[in-house]
Structure formats: C-alpha cells, structure tokens
Amino acid sequence: MKNRVCLVPAVLTIFLLCSVYAFAFEGPLQVKNQFPIFLPINQPYLEQASTESSFSLSLSHSSVFVMEDSAHWTAHLDLELTELNLRCRKDIPDLFEVGVDIPVLRATPGFMDRPLEWYHDTFGFPDYGRNTRPQNEFLYDVKKDGAPLIEGDSDRVGFGDVRLTLKKKIASIDPVISILADVELPTGNARIGYGSGSIDSAIAVLLDKDLGSETRLYANLGAVFPGDLKAHQTMKLDNFFYAGTGAESLIWPHCSLLAQIMVQTSPFPHTGISQIDNTAVIVTLGGRYYIATGSFELSLTEDPNTSGAPDFILNFSYKKRF
C-alpha cells in the first residue's frame, strides 16, 4: 500500500511535466518551396524567432508539372521530388543559435499522376496539360538559348547544398524578435538540379507574437543573395525577397493546428516563362503532436497561383529537443 501511495506523486509529476512540454511552441511547419528550378537557390523556411537546441528529420514529397517555352528559354518538367532534410540547431545561451541543414534529394517519375488525374476530374480543377504526357514518366529539361542549363537524372540520390545558419535575438520579451543569417555551400550537383554551384547567402528578420497562452503568430521578412548558377551553363541570378506569416493554435494539450503562407519573388532574370517569372505563393496547413522531448508534424502545401512552386508538397517531420 505504501508503494502505491508513493507512486501517486510520481505519476502526477510526469503528467505535469508532459503538460508543460505540450505548451512549448516549436515554430512554423518545416516546409520550404520545392520548385525544382528554385530549390537549389537557398530556399527559405518560415522560421521562429525563438532559439532552441534540437535535431529534426523532415521528409517532403512534391509533384511538379511545367511545359513552357519562350524566345530564349525552355522549361519542361514532369516529375516528383523527395527531400530528406537533417536539421540541427544549438542554442548558446546569451549569445546566439547556430545551425546546419543537410538535404538529401531524389527526383523520380513518381506515382501520383493517376491520383492527381482523379483529383482534377472529380473537383473540376485544371490539370495544366498533364493529360498530354504519359503517366509517371520523368522529364526535367531546362534550356537557355537552345543549350542545356539543367538536365535532371531520374532516380538519382544525392546531397543538396548544405546550409549554415546563425540566429541572434534582439528582443526577448514578447514579441520576440531575431535576426537570422545563413550561408549555403555548393555541395550539390548543379547540372542535375541538386545544387547551385555557388555560395548563396541570406538575411531575415523574424518575429514571434503570443496571443494568450494557446496561440502564437510568426512573421518573417527576408532577402536572399545567390551567387551565379553554375550548371551546364553559368548564369547570373537576381537577389530575391520573401515574406511569410503563420499561426499555431493549441486545440488539445498535446495537439496544435498550424496555417502559414509564404510569398517570394523569382531568383531568375526575366525568362518569358510564367512559372519562373511570376511571384510564388505557397500556403501550408498542418498539425503537430507534442511529446515530452519533441514533436511530430504533418502538413500539406498548395500553390494557389500556380507559379514558382510545386502543385503540392506533403511533409512529415520529427523534432527532438535537447
């Protein structure tokens, strides 16, 4: 009987600790723009201003279809892209947070053409010309002035460009405000679209704002400064800018719903290809389940203006806090 009585405080303590962890917000959903032509050019995540020590595994799968030609450019893409991203963050108290992102990529013919055909037919959405192509057949061919720029390699697994990050808080009391700087190293193969071939850099202002104890807003404003794209040809890229915002709301002690949107300009000079030139918009909806030492999240991303972004992105992520 005495042992049973002693168990009660222990169980209550564990329950309370789990409850505390459940209310520790972990930032926006770990999703970035997977448009294959843009992906190697230091694509930003929507980030939290708060710092942390953590390790994340993020698995994303997307589908892209582009069939456009202009006077000087050809962009023919019909593929699915899978990315496994290993993300590590280390908070050095009273100084800054340092981090590294290591992506592993695989472009494939995919398996989603038939489900997408059913989806478009059922709900009456346009299919962007998908019905003119054989189902689940790989194509990734980008040309400039008739010469290859990027030629994808089906089923090739390879590293993308590794990113190093540095985050510094400039305001620690709600709202939390930070400056984020990063450098992306040319570790990926640019000729097949897995890297840029140059060092890219970026800087952003991040903000977290609490609305009570169960809702948090996130906002980012940033600029990316890419080097030249050194693929089959070398071409100069433009600086591009992005803005994003999101919200997370706890609906249950261990569960939250998240919604976010990100808008970005194109890193390419004018090509005459609408899906490359126009502003990209990605909208993400998802959920997160908190555990004592981290969280799991699942999300779906859509491109409402069908430019500069995949048709959809499915993402599953796991984060462990230290």
Question: What function would you assign to each model-found segment?
Answer:
Residues 1-10:
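Bacterial N-terminal signal peptides that target proteins for export
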Residues 24-227, 236-300, 311:
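Transmembrane beta-barrel domains of Gram-negative outer membranes and organellar outer membranes
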Residues 300-306, 315:
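A short, acidic, flexible beta-alpha connecting loop/helix-capping segment that sits on the rim
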Residues 9-19:
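Bacterial N-terminal signal peptides
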Residues 320-322:
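Flexible, glycine-rich linker and terminal segments associated
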